[in-house]
Amino acid sequence: MARCCRHLAVFLCVLLMLSLCKALSSNVDDGYGHEDGSFESDSLLKLNNDDVLSLISSDETTLEASTVSVSNFGAKGDGKTDDTQAFKKAWKKACSTNGVTTFLVPKGKTYLLKSTRFRGPCKSLRNFQILGTLSASTKRSDYKDKNHWLILEDVNNLSIDGGSTGIINGNGKTWWQNSCKIDKSKPCTKAPTALTLYNLKNLNVKNLRVKNAQQIQISIEKCNKVEVSNVEITAPGDSPNTDGIHITNTQNIRVSNSDIGTGDDCISIEDGTQNLQIFDLTCGPGHGISIGSLGDDNSKAYVSGINVDGAKFSESDNGVRIKTYQGGSGTAKNIKFQNIRMENVKNPIIIDQDYCDKDKCEDQESAVQVKNVVYKNISGTSATDVAITLNCSEKYPCQGIVLENVKIKGGTASCKNANVKNQGTVSPKCS
């Protein structure tokens, strides 16, 4: 009997410790994710990030995985019926379901949507599968929010997967025709971003096609730990402001194996972007990869840790560009562009610290400091007489600019207020 009592006591202690671990994992991040760093209780028990994720995962696997399809909530998918409310109902169900959950947009159908917000936090939503087509309403009156069409926000540990068949179609022609950049007689008004990803952690976007956005195609804002791979983004070369991927206030991003051709920047990188890795990108038509514009309206801007390794630019207005306004402040630093091919690009390499997108900009002394920028193993042809432009600030000259094995045919170099070091074969050279 005594032995049985001892065994029972040990068993109860184990149960108590497991309960304590589960309680601690709940305190880390309310059960919806985890933060960087480790958690230490007042007791002798210590949990690191891997321990917390393990506890959460083991808790989820005890519940049955489920799929929530928009078809089960009344979505027709005929391309004509407004499916907005059906999507909202399906999202509410998926977001509140326990266990690993998938929000499913079925293959082979086209779902007409007005402006729609998919908001978290969610209990255990892990997959957003877009296997069919999301098609934007062409009625401008259907957009109460003129800045956004689809918004996904406040959801952690999520995969957005197009399965190579999923399409997001912004049907932007109506908006382009009414743009002041196309018709100077019309007032300049706002237009929606097709897909806004806001305040997300541990996000994976893959195997997705986005086309013909009303304005920006994909905007990544205030996110951390983002992976984008195998995406195709397209819009006509004359479509206004249709940036492919716009990144701001986001850290730890990787974009790889993607093809982007639009009427604006293939990738635009703005204030607050840190540790961005871009691999194996094809760009064109478009305005290339642009860091900036930074420092508009005399603002402070900070961008650092940008690495572009492996890219091809074809018939684009720019290749790799850094652009800042006069009057701004801050830094754009620790930037590397390498292993890049230019084919008939108008401005293959350009730093422009006198950028102005208005009729007239006043001369100002202050500027964003550009420093520690490396251009390595870049070759190809320029479509203009100037292949390399380094137009830096007089008061805050560009520092630590390195050109290594850069060979661009068909143009000269124009360099002003730039501290440049040449390594290997460089042509054309700054005089």
From Swiss-Prot:
It catalyses: (1,4-alpha-D-galacturonosyl)n+m + H2O = (1,4-alpha-D-galacturonosyl)n + (1,4-alpha-D-galacturonosyl)m. Residues 1-23 form the signal peptide. It comes from the Eukaryota. Expressed in flower buds and siliques, in the dehiscence zone of anthers (stomium cells) and maturing siliques. Expressed in stigma during pollen tube growth. Not expressed in seeds or in the floral part or leaf abscission zone but found at the junction between the seed and the funiculus at the site of seed abscission. Keywords: Cell wall, Cell wall biogenesis/degradation, Cytoplasm, Glycosidase, Hydrolase, Repeat, Secreted, Signal. GO terms for cellular component: cytoplasm; extracellular region. Disruption phenotype: Impaired pod shatter. Its EC number is 3.2.1.15. The active site is at D264, H287. Its main location: secreted. InterPro entries: Glyco_hydro_28, PbH1, Pectin_lyas_fold, Pectin_lyase_fold/virulence. PbH1 repeats lie at residues 223-249, 250-271, 303-324, 332-353, 398-420. Polygalacturonase involved in cell separation in the final stages of pod shatter and in anther dehiscence. Not involved in floral organ abscission. This is Polygalacturonase ADPG1. It comes from Arabidopsis thaliana. The gene is ADPG1.
